[in-house]
Amino acid sequence: MKKYIMCFLLIQISFSQINPGEVIWEENFDNLDNWIIETGNGSWGWGNGELQYYKPENVEIVEVPEETGNNAVQITAKEESGADITDQWGNPLNYTSGRINTKSKVSVKYGVIETRVLIPDIDLGGWPAVWLLGLSNLTWPRNGEIDIMEMGQRQSFRDLHDEHNGGNGLNNSTVNQVVGANAIFYADEALVPDNPTGAASISWDPDDDFCRPYYNYDNLTDRFLKYRVYWNPDSILFSVIDNEIEHFLFTDVFNIDSVSDEFHSPFYFVSNLALGGNFTDAYSLGDPASGSQIELPFPAKMLVDYIKVMKWGEYGEVNEGPPEFQGGDFGLFTDLTPTDNGLTPGLDAEIYVWEGTLTEGDIQPYEGENGIAWSTTGLGWFGAGIM
């Protein structure tokens, strides 16, 4: 999926201001109690044309090699097929992998988030990531996404950015030599015919102001690296720590404003090792001619040693467990009746109508001037809802 960069307002920040505070939450992967293991291939390869089927068997807790007593979560990508390894339409797939998330278990809002990760050889077709998704019920990208780290970017992306952060400007990097980060949100200005989701992305800026990738031509796949996102109500910025040297992925700070206010809400953690799809140079689901064949060596094992959340100044919140229960009167199709809470479609909720089953109706509102009315098309089963 092509994502668009926009012009943003800037705030100034000095490197001396970038200091993590106390640790307020830490996941050391002694178990998976905080995590949900996802399965399947999603809708059209998780929306990206990915080629893997996620299985619980591909996620396990292991001891980090040469670090006795230190555990990590290991996500293993394999070349395998079987009767139950299919896409949503039942077509066979040739790869499996793992994906985990903390939705309804752990969420974070602001702070410095750091993770320590070891990536396998992913050349070609691997797409490992540790990232965050907004807890909002809105669909992507209106719920927001923060990519703490991801690798496997296609050649055109790597060539576009390779004059900064260790790049040599020769357009000759491999996927094992480049790692990036990103923040994605919805913007009307990004809604164009070849970007129907309206996803705006700070990593696609050709000037590399807000989120430039990090290059190391000795490869990034033979050692653990640390990755950070610094996040407060005003800004988001990223860094990579390689051999204990912190490399900042920005020259101008990305300023959170009314367009990107998704980042004023809580997010949950996701980690996965995808294969193929439109982020990579490999082909996409259902279209073998769209890219190269998967060539990375299997099994490919990604290790996430820890994830920790630290204060950044006064900011940093972690919630463990489901969202807090709210009581009171909730407005459902009310206009004048006083309520304690409600939902605004397009802001914190979406209206869903089963395609082709309903048309606009003419029932008048019970009160006030606003209402929703549908009529069935008479095609049988019909449905709609608000989420």
Can you say where each PLM-predicted feature lies in the sequence?
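Sec-dependent N-terminal signal peptides
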Residues: 3-16
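Boundary/junction segments of secreted and surface-exposed precursor proteins
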Residues: 17-18, 319-338
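Extracytoplasmic/periplasmic beta-strand context in beta-sandwich domains
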Residues: 27, 128-129, 144, 305, ...
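GH16 jelly-roll
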Residues: 17-320
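Short stretches within intrinsically disordered, low-complexity N-terminal or propeptide regions
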Residues: 183-185, 202, 348-351, 375, ...
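Short beta-strands within extracellular/lumenal beta-sheet-rich domains
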Residues: 211-212, 375-387
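Extracellular glycan-recognition surfaces and repeat-rich motifs
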Residues: 36-74, 334-380
